[in-house]
Amino acid sequence: MKAIHFTEMLRQIDQAYQHRALVDVYAYKGETGAIIHYRGWLVHHVAWRQGFIRLRNPKNRELRTMPQIFIIQINNQKIYL
């Protein structure tokens, strides 16, 4: 499994947003610290300055907002700072 830097992850998220590509994201849940897997979600919005990302489920259009720092893996690539 390949590891990428946090800024490269931001570039990949931005490219997925521009090309409407599906992403596979593992992220921590803020309240409990549990790891949640978002498989095949679309990037709905990216807020670079606020540090948040919004993902949308293409099947039921559910939206999830998460801090970018909580993402630990994207498209089978680990994230390091």
What residue spans do the PLM features occupy?
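Acidic, low-complexity, intrinsically disordered interaction modules
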Residues: 34-49
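Mixed-charge, Lys/Arg-rich low-complexity intrinsically disordered regions
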Residues: 1-19
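Structured surface patches comprising rigid loops and adjacent beta-strands/short helices at the edges
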Residues: 43-46, 65-80
